[in-house]
């Protein structure tokens, strides 16, 4: 139906066709129709798209849509619909529209007739207009909208119009109408009702009417009502018909009304509306006939939609219909005219709008054109300007080019002229230079013949002359001299092969590593150099090397203690200066970095208390303090950068910064973090074997993977891949899984074997069948799960049970067979006094312990290779891997940075378990830290200052007698050998009585054509006046000398003299390393001796540091002579080296002979020698204790000396606070045996250990502290029998810890004990103490005792175990019988337990007045300041001296050498030596060269100390040769210090080491447990005591390495020096040191009969070291007398 309308749209849309109008194509119409069906009123955007798509104007589109809408409206009229029905009757046959309910209500007979005609005629039903809604629909819609209060939505649900008939009685229906209802129903059922398809009407979206101004069209109804299709179902119309039928039958025909049952559905209201479908003209057809007809029809048909057959025959109604049709046609014609008029108006309006739009577009277009014209004009203008600019630039450039060309032409001409002039000048200059060079060569040759030449150049000149066949290098031409580098490949080896260089040591670790040898020598030199600063006794290199191989060396303990004290003192000094603002030394304040801030920060990070280090540093605790210091300094495992704040129990708003971090340190770590954090460090686990396999680790996974691979093994990448595939370890969390695997495989050589580079396999005994791989992996995964869940406590016994699964611990001895089974849980072990297992050469355990003559078992320290293999990275293997097994980030320190191995060794065991190399590395690291502190730095600066001043003074004295010296030397040089010939070598035999005579000999190499005189300045520069040289060696070409005069000799003599002056000054005040000299290859020659005496074994050795870092030794006279002969004295370096070698020749050879006589055999190197035994020196006798009985006896004696030292220090009353303040209990629990020093209960009648009866009443009346003090007094009186008797009972440190614990328990105040600490519990505790055999057991005992003391009786700064572990108070004491919880991070070592014990003891409040003790360290102050004892100036403060010191001053004839630490005859402890007698006088009866007046501090007749008057200013030469020594001040006795005089004043530097008299009251923490003592009077820490006699100034040859304080430990290796200046600075000339006024004294002393016997600590006689007493060298070391160790006290430590 729409299709026809669409085709006629172009013609009928406008009513009239225009002549220019074009028809639209089919495609355009199709698009327009589709658009119209979707949107009858298209928007501008849609029209624009259509305009582009269809090529139509917007006006054409508007007109088309307007006509299309009008056509749509026209298609709804009845005439058009009738025409359509007539045209297509067949199309409407099947459509039977319903009868309009409104027609029935209004009585419209026209509809009835049309319906009748349609049914009886052609069969085509008469329908309503297309989209005209019925009256019933309109009323229903209005009714619903009235109820809803709003209009219906277009897209809402369909409104129902057909309903079932009402039941009888409902809404006014009669109850009985059976006949009518039945007839109606039957009539309805007989009529075939075909409902029309309403879907097209429903789906049709009727647009909003455009022409609403036409009154005939329904314009008042909204889009909702228009779009609702009429309903043909039973509904409201049916109900209304029924009601009307009822009203007609009741006689109400005249007044038709709507039934009151439907009050809101007022149909009459819709009839009068303009938009209603019924016209008002239809009222005329409402007649009584019609009403009666409808009543009859209603009675016959209850349903109004049922057609009546009588309607067909009503002809009258046809006429009405025709009339109505005509009327409608008229109306439509009128409407069409109006529409056409309206369209014309719209067309005109659109044309007007189009005209306006075109005008606007034209204006816009003109504006845009105008802007375009302006823009083009501007662009053209800019282009013209740019072109003009370019033209101008090109013109300028052209002018510039022309100008340059002109200038270049001029310059070229000028340059050509200049070149010609220059060529002429050069020709003249070349000629002039040639002549000048010839003259210069002549002068240089003449000068080189008189002066020293650079050694390497000299050698190259000799090689060149020899190659060219010239008789002398003087004949070399200028070209050859300029190209000497061409002859470098022809240089010979130097030192020559005739100089036999040997390896210095024959045992490990020295024979395999030159780095270790270098570290050993440099460490020893540092300690000897700063012995006065550190407070050390001098010791030889032999003793030092032997200490590395002893099990428990006393020397190592003393060295570590003084170094730790120095470091802590540096920290304390800086902190005190920063806190108070005033420092005792301004250097400290100026250099806060000297206080080791990195150590302080590290200690804070680890939770260590530096105050505890200072208070508790002693012979027992130093290994643990060393471990904590190493961790703090970053030498151990590195802490991860984690935001962890450790909150201490007593942390009160502490701030962590570089200045006050020391003050804010609190002991321990935070209670809530301590346990978990330290468990991650692995410190809570006991020491485990390095070969154990922890489930979940990389090592565990690698072992199971490789056990299936056989002997070929896998490389690292394959192992990592298979581990990942097996699921035993997740390597994806690691950034470097291959590195982790490689580290795990390379560390354990017992389980894994390297078969190729980066390829490993397991040992044969651990390999498995590859067919069982799944089973093995399943078991391994199960073990990992069990381990993580805590089911399996993987201990050693567990591994022993799984030996068949290759997870057992293998022996840690590298020589033990790996197939050794562990079925025997208790293999035979030899426990001896040293605590190690003896091993035979085959590596097996020796079941029979070695016995000494005393019947005591003896085993020396383990060999180096065993120690190196025995203790490896257990901490890294175990703790870190355990932490990684629980997550990569769980570990608190970095797995890739494990630190030094010796730090881990101190965690796992005591210091005695470290290997020699680890001990050396520990010392190197400790010295590296110490050199960064202010103590060493200040000492270096002051020594540099003093040495510089002394050099100027010494050179000034030489200058005062310059004229006399020149005359004397020239006379001696030219009159001694009047008959000497050129090239003749003159050598005078060395005198056997005087070293000076031998030093006068100057052997000259036969290859030297011109020999230079060597001046012995030994007797020239050492005194205030110079003496005439008696024998001046040296041979010169006298004819040449006569020609050149005396100038060369004078200059050469002056240079050598000045160099020697500087050398001697730096030797007295060492601030840098000074070797003997260097050769042409810059190999350096060293002499490491503690003194210049011939009795020092070091005097008989010369170490050679080769250029490549190797160390060799010259220990034979032949090698020495060959070396001296091979030196070319014309060279600068070798001339000085030759001079120094000649100076030490006599002492070297004599000491060498003594060494050979004292050690006729070789050292015990049976299993450690290299293949080339001829190159190994035998001068070092290192006793390992496994070669013969003598060595075993020596080892045993040294160990007894160490035990005595330990007992003496630990039994001292100042060792524990319990000694001073402890309460005397009425019922002591223990007593200590006087025979064997073992503990036993008071009730025991005899000692269970030795069987000694204790019936004496005196012992029973003494408290336990008095018994310990009595034992210490016996020890200091010389009764050391209990030490020997108790050595075999239990280890030394275990016994000492037991005594200390018992003493603390016996001194606890009774009121301070908890209520649960009953007598039975106390006895049980004592039984556990006596039965303890390990440090772990003793730590349990200590923790139990700590829990028994009330918190009020402990210092507030002390954190108990309960507080640190976060336990409730008293939780530790809940079940003491089953063990207590201990701090897991404290190592189970003697040092760790002892440090905790001393810390606990110092925190106990024994007495109420304890805090009032002035000697008690005040806890309220952080680091109570100590007086700086380093190089104190005595101008303002004089130190009181003890009677022993005064007596020492009177021993003028045997006064000690200040250069060796000055140990007097009173020995180490301040008392006369035992078994030595009075010091012997000189054998030849000669008196000492220097007479010393009574010292300033000597005692008067009343015993009072007097102050010696100051030395008078020294004059010139008026006092003669000895005038300078008469006024010289003797060094202050009793201190290790440095004394010197500058000009006319006095300058005294003193170091008070541990003297109480020089310490303030608050410093007794440093001296409460002095370690540097020996009541037998031993001189050295290893037992040697020294007596020193007078020695020549010539022999003071102990140059010490220099330390600049800022270096690291690595700088000790090889050629790395610790110097404030360069290595070769001593070679430089200082011309400004010409005008000083000090004279030097030369003392010629005969020390041929210098012979005395030293006695070491264990009674063996050794040669001492004799040293002269010349004034020039009395500045090295002063005699050390510790007031604490002198006889003025009641005991050594009181």
From Swiss-Prot:
Localization (cell): Nucleus
Record's keyword annotation contains ATP-binding: no
Bias (Acidic residues) ranges: 795-816, 1561-1578, 1589-1605, 1624-1635
GO biological process entries: flower development; negative regulation of DNA-templated transcription; regulation of transcription by RNA polymerase II; vegetative to reproductive phase transition of meristem
Annotated transmembrane regions: none
Major location category of this protein: nucleus
Tissue-specific expression: Highly expressed in growing tissues such as inflorescence and flower meristems, young leaves and floral organs. Expressed in roots, rosette and cauline leaves, stems, flowers, inflorescences and siliques.
A GO cellular component entry from the record: nucleus
The HTH HARE-type domain, residue ranges: 696-765
Gene3D superfamilies: Homeodomain-like (1.10.10.60)
Ranges of compositional bias, category Basic residues: 1471-1485, 1515-1531
Domain of life assignment: Eukaryota
CDD domains linked: homeodomain
Bias (Gly residues) ranges: 1459-1470
Entry-linked InterPro entries: Asxl_HARE-HTH, DDT_dom, HD, Homeodomain-like_sf, RLT1-3, WHIM1_dom, WHIM2_dom
Single GO term (MF): DNA-binding transcription factor activity
Biological function: Transcriptional regulator required for the maintenance of the plant vegetative phase. In association with CHR11 or CHR17 may prevent the early activation of the vegetative-to-reproductive transition by regulating key genes that contribute to flower timing, such as FT, SEP1, SEP3, AGL8/FUL, SOC1 and FLC. Involved in the transcriptional regulation of seed-specific gene expression.
Known partners and oligomeric status: Interacts with CHR11. Interacts (via the DDT domain) with CHR11 (via C-terminus).
Protein name, entry field: Homeobox-DDT domain protein RLT2
Organism this protein belongs to: Arabidopsis thaliana
